[in-house]
């Protein structure tokens, strides 16, 4: 990430930034980000729309929906650990600190917008409550319906459809409402103690075969590339541990 000084100088001088995470990226021609997920899932036994709750220890393994597993990689929300592992008394001392972890939600609004040449538009402004437009229609022509250009407009708060429609009238590129979704857990908010808490949780869980992975499991502000990198690193660790065990 650029420094504060670099941000100010680049904005004053209208200098393009080429090193930031969104300066260049690959995007699927069809299917969007779901295409990547489906591709990675090929050849794997994935059970969709299943709740992995009430995971219990049995015979030195973990019982998940009637099947026994040596290890569990938990990619959910760390605030739900107690629900997923109800018999782990070792977790109870952590519950007060886990409950204090802060987070932020987002209302995402699917819209039609005027054609433009942008991918992301960051637009903090006192005149409206949105902070950015993600021009998904410009990532691939297949994201659009004919000549209609689509975008996702984000608001950092929960909003009603009526509030959204009024806000869209104030936003550039003439957005037209199509649908919206409120996600309570979008961004983990870290403080000086959150990483210490997650480290201590890992030290407690990993000897028992439970591993935390992902944005809300590790309470880290992972972008997708960083999340995938963390998954690959954990996979290497687990493979090495398996070889050590023989």
Please place each PLM-identified region on the residue numbering.
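Hydrophobic, Leu/Ile/Phe/Ala-enriched alpha-helical segments that form helix-helix packing faces
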Residues: 40, 44, 164-172, 242
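General beta-strand structural signal in soluble alpha/beta enzymes
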Residues: 48, 212-213
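Short alpha-helical patches at coil-to-helix transitions and adjacent helical residues
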Residues: 33, 37, 224, 228-232
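Alpha-helix boundary/capping residues
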Residues: 11, 15, 88-89, 171, ...
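Internal hydrophobic alpha-helix adjacent to the cofactor/substrate pocket in enzyme cavities
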Residues: 228-246
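Active-site catalytic microenvironments for nucleophilic, acid-base chemistry
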Residues: 43, 80, 84, 237, ...
């Amino acid at each position: 990430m650029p420094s504060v000084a670099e941000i100010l100088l680049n904005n004053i001088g209208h200098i393009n930034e080429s090193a930031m995470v969104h300066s260049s990226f690959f995007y699927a021609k069809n299917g969007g980000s779901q295409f990547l997920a489906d591709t990675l899932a090929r050849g794997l036994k994935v059970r969709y729309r299943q709740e992995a709750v009430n995971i219990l220890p049995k015979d030195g393994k973990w019982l998940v929906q009637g099947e026994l597993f040596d290890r569990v990689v938990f990619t959910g929300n760390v605030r739900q650990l107690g629900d997923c592992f109800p018999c782990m008394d070792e977790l109870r001392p952590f519950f007060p600190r886990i409950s204090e972890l802060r987070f932020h939600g987002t209302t995402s609004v699917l819209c039609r917008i005027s054609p433009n040449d942008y991918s992301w538009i960051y637009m903090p402004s006192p005149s409206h409550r949105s902070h950015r437009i993600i021009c998904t229609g410009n990532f691939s022509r297949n994201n659009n319906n004919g000549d209609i250009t689509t975008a996702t407009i984000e608001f950092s708060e929960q909003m009603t459809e009526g509030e959204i429609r009024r806000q869209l009238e104030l936003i550039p590129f003439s957005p037209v409402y199509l649908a919206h979704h409120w996600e309570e857990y979008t961004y983990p908010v870290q403080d000086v103690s959150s990483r210490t808490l997650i480290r201590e949780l890992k030290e407690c869980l990993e000897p028992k075969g439970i591993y935390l992975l992902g944005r809300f499991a590790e309470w880290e502000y992972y972008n997708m590339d960083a999340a995938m990198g963390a998954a690959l690193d954990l996979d290497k660790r687990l493979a090495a541990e398996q070889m050590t065990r023989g």
